[in-house]
Amino acid sequence: QIGAKGDFAIPLMTPVTLDKERKELLNVIVAQINTVLYTIIPGMNIEVRDYGKQALDSGEDGWKVELMSAREGRYPIPIRMESEGIIKIISVLNALIQAFGNPSICLAIDELDAGIFEYMLGELLDIFQNSAKGQLIFTSHNLRALEMLDKESIMFSTANPENRYIHMKNVKGSNNLRSMYIRSITLGGQDELIYEETDSLEIARAFRKAGRSVRNG
């Protein structure tokens, strides 16, 4: 969903019926998003397709609309037909725009990296770190963030529920944080265990066992 003023949000996967005020606000939001979206995904814009008047549950006039993906030289398609990564970017872009320019905003996004191309994720983080006025807090499984953010800005999850997040210790300015993280998984050396060890041989046996059960019915 696209965050906007207050709790106003628009579903990306289905059409929605809006009153006149929210329809006009949606047009403003889409214009803001397109200003940035075109630079992230060249040739792409969002369009608001208006299916005409449709009564709201209250009986008042409403307009049924749907967000469409418009690319140069192609017919517009519903946003829901785009890739997971593009849908993710569109869903958070307006909120990122607001946080970028407003120092009073602290934006929290779970799994910011979900479906987003790794290089693009790095570019977004670099721009936000160097130029944003607001604050961005996010979770990510993608290690690209370790290469783009200052070490003071990164906390790592641990296997200890009593001490779930830590800063990595013994990090020097010349260290590659991504390499240190992987080394800490295999060799340890941090105050907490940051990954519960798995046995690759045991995993392989489990796959073979599951495969046999499928073949044997």
Specify the residue positions occupied by each region the protein language model found.
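Phosphate-coordinating catalytic segments in nucleotide- and nucleic-acid-processing enzymes
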Residues: Q1-I89, T186-L193, K209, S213-G217
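Short, hydrophobic/aromatic alpha-helical segments in well-folded domains
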Residues: Q32-I33, A95, E123-L124
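Short, conserved, surface-exposed binding loops centered on an aromatic residue
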Residues: L37, R80-M81, I97-G101, I127-N130, ...
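GG-anchored amphipathic helix commonly corresponding to the ABC/SMC/Rad50 NBD signature/C-loop
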Residues: R71-E72, P78-L107, Y119
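Walker B catalytic acidic pair
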Residues: D110-L112
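Conserved D-loop-proximal element of ABC-family nucleotide-binding domains
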Residues: A114-E118
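C-terminal lobe/lid and adjacent interdomain/linker elements of RecA-like ASCE P-loop ATPase modules
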Residues: G122-G217
